[in-house]
């Protein structure tokens, strides 16, 4: 679904990924679980494209629900995969999820359903990424859409948001989300539950990196889009802590 001009949203609840379209050229942002590949292919066809049209794959971070079918797309298209340097090693591994946080909260019905969807969509059959390129904070990636990298560690060491200044769009990954993966509740901008973050204190501090961006449409890794100033988004997120 095209949610903004040149930005297509793909979803298998509660997991989001996106395609940036620029002059007919496509960048895939995140890549769900392995089992979501067929959903992605069908979604591409619905907008008049094929998998071969993907020119680059960029990851907000190296968790299995964001890189699940990235290697399959890379092999099918020879499109390069890009990830922040601090998550580069993790991107070459399998089973990268905050397992302790998920399993310790599996008594919650929604978290249990998230685990069930992970297993049902091939989390244990993830093909590791065999070739990936590192980027650093502040880079402007030479891929369709020219996203700006904002390193915002805490959820993972290499967590980033991708900023598209000309479009007023921030693809926030799991820096800020709008759905609680513990309860399933929808809401405004929020930091993922503390048990899901590699460094929860850092995940909270890092929000200030986004404050000066101004008004954007924020596209999270989990939940619905949100529009407003990032200063307001940060205030809302901190009010939920």
What are these regions (language model features)?
Residues 27-29, 58, 81, 169-171, ...:
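Residue-level marker for buried hydrophobic side chains located in beta-strands
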Residues 225-241:
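Binuclear metal-ion centers of metallo-dependent hydrolases, dominated by the metallo-beta-lactamase
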């Amino acid at each position: 679904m095209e949610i903004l001009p040149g930005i297509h949203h793909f979803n298998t609840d509660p997991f989001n990924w996106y395609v940036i379209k620029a002059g007919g050229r496509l960048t895939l942002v995140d890549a769900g679980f392995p089992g979501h590949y067929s959903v992605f292919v069908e979604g591409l066809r619905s907008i008049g494209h094929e998998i071969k049209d993907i020119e680059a794959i960029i990851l907000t971070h190296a968790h299995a629900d964001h890189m699940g079918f990235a290697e399959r797309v890379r092999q099918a298209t020879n499109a390069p995969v890009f990830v922040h340097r601090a998550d580069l090693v993790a991107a070459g591994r399998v089973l990268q999820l905050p397992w302790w946080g998920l399993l310790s909260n599996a008594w919650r019905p929604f978290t249990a359903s998230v685990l069930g969807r992970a297993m049902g969509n091939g989390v244990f059959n993830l093909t590791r990424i065999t070739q990936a390129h590192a980027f650093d904070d502040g880079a402007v990636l030479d891929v369709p859409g020219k996203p700006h990298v904002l390193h915002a560690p805490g959820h993972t060491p290499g967590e980033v948001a991708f900023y598209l200044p000309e479009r007023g769009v921030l693809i926030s990954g799991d820096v800020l989300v709008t759905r609680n993966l513990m309860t399933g509740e929808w809401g405004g901008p929020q930091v993922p539950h503390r048990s899901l973050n590699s460094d929860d204190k850092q995940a909270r501090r890092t929000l200030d990196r986004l404050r000066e961006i101004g008004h954007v449409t924020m596209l999270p890794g989990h939940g619905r889009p949100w529009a407003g100033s990032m200063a307001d988004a940060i205030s809302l997120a901190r009010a939920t802590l």
